[in-house]
């Protein structure tokens, strides 16, 4: 197999959707046994206290959320537009995602970003949950 330059790889990534990139990262992590998590986040995790380290993290505040589209409601076109704005998906991909609800729109995002996305989607007429 020919060796690809960094620029060629970046050009290939630019052509991919966010969902495709997310799947690529998961596959990369599994193949090489690594994680794409920032080292700062890993170092900050023990500071949460002994409860989280012992597996009892029910009381600990969650710092990463998944934005789940439960249903598009009556205003599906508005929801598709909002999904496109949040994810940079194409029209076809966003429409398929909305029609396949319940589906995650954003995964492992910060609390404030998840809440903003939820508000935007609900404003467009969708039913959304954060997990």
From Swiss-Prot:
SUPFAM superfamilies: ClpS-like, Ribosomal protein L7/12, oligomerisation (N-terminal) domain. GO terms for cellular component: cytosolic large ribosomal subunit. GO terms for molecular function: mRNA binding; structural constituent of ribosome. NCBIfam families: L12 (TIGR00855). Homodimer. Part of the ribosomal stalk of the 50S ribosomal subunit. Forms a multimeric L10(L12)X complex, where L10 forms an elongated spine to which 2 to 4 L12 dimers bind in a sequential fashion. Binds GTP-bound translation factors. Belongs to the bacterial ribosomal protein bL12 family. This is Large ribosomal subunit protein bL12. It comes from Nocardioides sp. (strain ATCC BAA-499 / JS614).
